[in-house]
Amino acid sequence: MASASSVSLMLLVAAAMASAASAQLSATFYDTSCPNALSTIKSAVTAAVNSEPRMGASLVRLHFHDCFVQGCDASVLLSGQEQNAGPNAGSLRGFNVVDNIKTQVEAICSQTVSCADILAVAARDSVVALGGPSWTVLLGRRDSTTANESQANTDLPAPSSSLAELIGNFSRKGLDVTDMVALSGAHTIGQAQCQNFRDRLYNETNIDSSFATALKANCPRPTGSGDSNLAPLDTTTPNAFDSAYYTNLLSNKGLLHSDQVLFNGGSTDNTVRNFSSNTAAFNSAFTVAMVKMGNISPLTGTQGQIRLNCSKVN
């Protein structure tokens, strides 16, 4: 058995390696090799979101679900595997938009810009397109040659998660409680399927009664009936990236159980109150958290590859 000191040393080395990998990311990574990459991505994302506002949330979710499973390496884009995991099957979308972006970028810079970086930039540009804050995306990630379905099933937070489970999920990825509450604010856009909030509608008491009644019309009690019917995560301004998500929580109008637990007499109540009344504070915390999330275990240097097609390895 390893001694305590050797275990500590191994942890320090692992932390140093992770830090070094993140340090290799740079905002200017493509300035010389593909100077028009970012503007090309932005134009494609803006067009996609203008055509279908919901796509903005879908692209943000793709980046989140990528980073939480073996790091921000575009593993979520590989056909099958992670896409078949419980949290992803039948709900992940936006692959066609990513493929379109990749095709456009390949046309100007062959095998230069990674799919992982496209996801990171597309998430930022989606938030901006819906009126949210911007931030500097660090670049230089490379694409994985593997995906991990089992890790997707264990590491992605579930809509039924308790506050303690959410804190643990995010902590294991190097994200603190404020990061977790801020990143949850991405639910100010997007929609969820009835099967993910049915139990909350019919079995929980910390939900506004009129809010629940309105939702029940499109989400019947019997399991299997209307499972894929959609409802906006933020019923107030569903297509605007703002702080209304937190204001809704103050009124017990969180759609998912994992939303409302952020304001239910627990340790995150004050953060929710602050973000609800101070949009600037939310925007600041959100951008910081997105940069931190984008730095989770990236492949850099000669690790991985630059995929020619985001859905399969070269």
Curated annotation (Swiss-Prot):
Residues bound to substrate are 157
The cofactors it requires, by name, are: Ca(2+); heme b
What residues does heme b bind to? 187
An example GO CC term for this entry is:
extracellular region
Amino-acid positions noted as binding Ca(2+) 2 in the UniProt annotation, renumbered to this chain: 188, 234, 237, 242
Write the signal peptide boundaries. 1-23
Biological role = Removal of H(2)O(2), oxidation of toxic reductants, biosynthesis and degradation of lignin, suberization, auxin catabolism, response to environmental stresses such as wounding, pathogen attack and oxidative stress. These functions might be dependent on each isozyme/isoform in each plant tissue.
Q: What is this protein called?
A: Peroxidase 2
The organism named in the record is: Oryza sativa subsp. indica (Rice)
